[in-house]
Amino acid sequence: MIWHVQNENFILDSTRIFMKAFHLLLFHGSFIFPECILIFGLILLLMIDSTSDQKDRPWFYFISSTSLVMSITALLFRWKEEPIISFSGNFQTNNFNEIFQFLILLCSTLCIPLSVEYIECTEMAITEFLLFVLTATLGGMFLCGANDLITIFVAPECFSLCSYLLSGYTKRDVRSNEATTKYLLMGGASSSILVHGFSWLYGLSGGEIELQEIVNGLINTQMYNSPGISIALISITVGIGFKLSPAPFHQWTPDVYEGSPTPVVAFLSVTSKVAASASATRIFDIPFYFSSNEWHLLLEILAILSMILGNLIAITQTSMKRMLAYSSIGQIGYVIIGIIVGDSNDGYASMITYMLFYISMNLGTFARIVSFGLRTGTDNIRDYAGLYTKDPFLALSLALCLLSLGGLPPLAGFFGKLHLFWCGWQAGLYFLVSIGLLTSVVSIYYYLKIIKLLMTGRNQEITPHVRNYRRSPLRSNNSIEWSMTVCVIASTIPGISMNPILAIAQDTLF
């Protein structure tokens, strides 16, 4: 009898929860329509996987890519609509959030074709891989629009859990297991520190969780200049720092880059930074409005350490992926300049523009690494020597992406850095910009060192890996080539494209 009563209560409680969720989706679903498209794509993937065999693998790629493209289309149709706060204040929709969501969707759309050949060659499980990628994308999108502390914590955890699973996807690889373990342990520790900072904000504001209400609560309780705010600021900076991976919170980055499957590294290298940057701008700009001098100082220290350590250590690396890991640490230092400047001197606009270029430069480079690695089985920089003699197209495209990452004119990376540094200079960040300029010169050195290896024509310097290198017989139909071509074109866009891109970015400012 007791069991029947408990069972009935469980069914009633479950029904109430389901009806509440359905009610929220019915009345607020239009505000998260791009996210709903991805959720539908996830459900469709699971249904097809449970009812079909491995011969339907092309459908998995098609469904994933189509759902991402449709989500991008939904975002574009919603452009310039009035800002809306939905789900009882948990989620905010505005142009600023949507531009970051667009960047995350763009990353995922380019990463899926980049992964096709790798998955087929390594015989990885395709459905789970795509499910993790789409779920991580979904978590990143919700993080961009998060408007309260709970959503800001849950959304990145959704992204992080999928990231842990993706980084350890090749479970028979010892390096992958090591990378996943370090990633998981440090991620769990950083999440705990982040929640600790949120608890201070919650208590000091009188029990508020919405970002704007926290500011009002701090004013009402007169706690906006209390020592507790400093503790909250430091804790939250450490928590977000793990996601952005600036120095000294970068310890996980080189190992995860080296041990994880290369398409996974390509995905994580850009999406995590875009989502974390979107979250950082809102958290620092709204709840810590009265502590702007303090968080500016903290971010300046992180930017300087990242630009110096990232670029100097990258010079000494022999692995291509580890070199890009330290390079990405230096790159996030440049992005932090835009966060510090804020919207007063087009800091956010320049940051968004540079991140758009960084996506194309970084994914283009990783597309070349995937292609070369599948045909040679090596990641050592020395093994790229003489690649131009065997595959000029691959060598030239890799060289263009590396030069753009270094910021050489007239490539897109140069104009992105130029505008970012100019905004920093106008805001009075003279020392920070000077460090950025010097470290950019350092980065050009190690990029040019790789390009010199690519273009060498002396037989004694050509490695056995390149001598035995075979070009893809299906080059025109190769999905990696498609993704790489898009990235290379975007990386070499001349400066004439800067004005319309900046104008769009400036329209997003909240």
Curated annotation (Swiss-Prot):
Statement: the UniProt record of this protein carries the keyword S-adenosyl-L-methionine: no
Cellular component terms (Gene Ontology): chloroplast thylakoid membrane
Oligomeric and partner information: NDH is composed of at least 16 different subunits, 5 of which are encoded in the nucleus.
Catalyzed chemical reaction(s): a plastoquinone + NADH + (n+1) H(+)(in) = a plastoquinol + NAD(+) + n H(+)(out); a plastoquinone + NADPH + (n+1) H(+)(in) = a plastoquinol + NADP(+) + n H(+)(out)
Alphabetized InterPro entries for the sequence: NADH-Q_OxRdtase_suN/2, ND/Mrp_TM, Ndh2_N
GO biological process, one term: photosynthesis, light reaction
Principal subcellular localization: plastid
Alphabetical list of PANTHER family matching this protein: NADH DEHYDROGENASE (PTHR22773)
Record bears the keyword Nucleotide-binding: no
Compartments (UniProt record): Plastid, Chloroplast thylakoid membrane
EC number(s) per entry: 7.1.1.-
Known role: NDH shuttles electrons from NAD(P)H:plastoquinone, via FMN and iron-sulfur (Fe-S) centers, to quinones in the photosynthetic chain and possibly in a chloroplast respiratory chain. The immediate electron acceptor for the enzyme in this species is believed to be plastoquinone. Couples the redox reaction to proton translocation, and thus conserves the redox energy in a proton gradient.
Family per record: Belongs to the complex I subunit 2 family.
Pfam families referenced in this protein's UniProt entry, alphabetically: Ndh2_N, Proton_antipo_M
Organism of this sequence: Muilla maritima
Keywords recorded for this protein, A-Z: Chloroplast, Membrane, NAD, NADP, Plastid, Plastoquinone, Quinone, Thylakoid, Translocase, Transmembrane, Transmembrane helix, Transport
Protein name: NAD(P)H-quinone oxidoreductase subunit 2, chloroplastic
GO MF annotation terms: NADH dehydrogenase (ubiquinone) activity; quinone binding
Membrane topology: Multi-pass membrane protein
Annotated transmembrane regions: 24-44, 59-79, 99-119, 124-144, 149-169, 184-204, 229-249, 295-315, 323-343, 347-367, 395-415, 418-438
